[in-house]
């Protein structure tokens, strides 16, 4: 089965078993991500609970920056572990417990108290996610062969998106427009994270030798790596694919399409795009991840330019025009997600993957905060100005991607 998934046979039976465990556990975590999306699900829940707007506005920064910036502090710990899978297992289990805490807060509390409790649990979830992120690339690199990693992560993304599509359709139908069913979905997310931790714990990982070098040495190596610095620049420009979707929704709303304000619209666009593209992007990334980054940047820029043209023509709010633009943008976004992971795993030295991932992700966390703030400033003039800025970033990032080292050639 693993050979059919990856397109080439595993090096040994253990790699085949590990590949299937990666797909299963990663699929469960991606389902959880969709069920507890702070941009949509948690924002809706806090609105329903009567939490203040400033608390709701803190959800996305807590989740995004909290999952990236701490990684540089966690990487040294990971690289001192003989079996790095246990960091991922612990992170997934803690995310599960945090999600269950969010569901409990939504059931028992209201108003400001509910908002603060959910934000606190989300902060714990984000920190645990940072632990998973900084350890996963290292574990993937040690347990799955170089030409098969993108297929594993891509299939997980496509498989998980099926469940999220169903959830989105239920949201859009109005069947889940009550607090109770949404809390059940968040509880299910917690159980999926716990299940993923149990499955990942069975991974057959060869212990690594204990390290005796300075804890800061791997980070100094990473910071001096010109290839990594260029990658951070490219990935930093391509964060525009993650930041732009809410501004597309603003363009549609200003055009008169109230349907896009429903909770399920963005969830459906993202999940459908992930289902149709993640596995394909993953397989293409195994061949050339820098090419996928370039194509994704160009596609994102094109989608955003189309949005500007449609907005200027006054038809952005007509029918399903905006969801179609969002779908195209999310196709590009998932291409960036697949390719950035594969490039870093293939490029980083075997003994320093966690450090490389931590340096890159911490830098991206800071760039996300800065770019998000810049987008907010530009949108105060007009949402279209922010969209134009993100289109320029995506185009520049896509162009610079072709100057990256061909990680798969090595």
Where on the chain are the PLM-derived regions?
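Helix-to-coil boundary motifs at intracellular loop junctions of multi-pass secondary transporters
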Residues: 48-49, 80-81, 139-143, 251-256, ...
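Helix-loop junctions on the cytosolic side of multi-pass membrane transporters
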Residues: 197-213, 402-410
């Amino acid at each position: 089965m693993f050979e059919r998934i990856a397109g080439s046979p595993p090096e040994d039976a253990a790699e085949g078993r590990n590949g299937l465990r990666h797909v299963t556990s990663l699929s469960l975590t991606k389902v959880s991500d969709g069920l507890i999306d702070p941009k949509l699900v948690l924002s809706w829940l806090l609105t329903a609970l009567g939490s203040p707007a400033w608390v709701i506005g803190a959800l996305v920064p807590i989740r995004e920056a909290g999952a990236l910036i701490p990684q540089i502090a966690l990487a040294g710990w990971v690289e001192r572990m003989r079996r790095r899978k246990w960091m991922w297992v612990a992170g997934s289990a803690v995310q599960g417990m945090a999600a269950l805490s969010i569901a409990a807060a939504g059931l028992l509390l209201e108003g400001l108290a509910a908002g603060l409790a959910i934000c606190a649990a989300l902060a714990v979830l984000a920190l645990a996610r940072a632990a998973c992120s900084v350890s996963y690339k290292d574990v993937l690199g040690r347990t799955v062969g170089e030409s098969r990693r993108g297929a594993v992560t891509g299939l997980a993304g496509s498989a998980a998106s099926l469940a999220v599509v169903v959830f989105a359709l239920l949201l859009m139908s109005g069947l889940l427009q009550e607090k109770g069913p949404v809390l059940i979905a968040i509880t299910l997310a917690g159980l999926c994270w716990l299940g993923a931790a149990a499955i990942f714990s069975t991974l057959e990982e060869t212990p690594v030798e204990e390290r005796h070098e300075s804890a800061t040495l791997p980070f100094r190596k990473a910071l001096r790596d010109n290839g990594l610095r260029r990658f951070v620049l490219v990935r930093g420009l391509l964060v525009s694919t993650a930041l732009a979707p809410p501004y597309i929704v603003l363009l549609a709303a200003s055009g008169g399409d109230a349907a896009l304000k429903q909770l399920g619209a963005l969830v459906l666009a993202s999940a459908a795009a992930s289902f149709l593209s993640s596995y394909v992007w993953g397989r293409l990334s195994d061949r050339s991840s820098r090419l996928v980054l370039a194509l994704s940047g160009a596609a994102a820029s094109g989608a955003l330019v189309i949005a500007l043209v449609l907005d200027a023509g006054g038809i952005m709010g007509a029918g399903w025009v905006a969801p179609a633009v969002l779908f195209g943008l999310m196709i590009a976004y998932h291409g960036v997600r697949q390719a950035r992971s594969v490039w870093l795993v293939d490029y980083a030295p075997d003994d320093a993957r966690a450090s490389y991932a931590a340096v890159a992700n911490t830098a991206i966390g800071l760039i996300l905060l800065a770019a998000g703030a810049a987008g907010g400033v530009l949108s105060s003039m007009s949402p279209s100005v922010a969209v134009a800025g993100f289109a320029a970033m995506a185009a520049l990032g896509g162009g610079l991607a072709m100057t990256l080292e061909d990680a798969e050639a090595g």
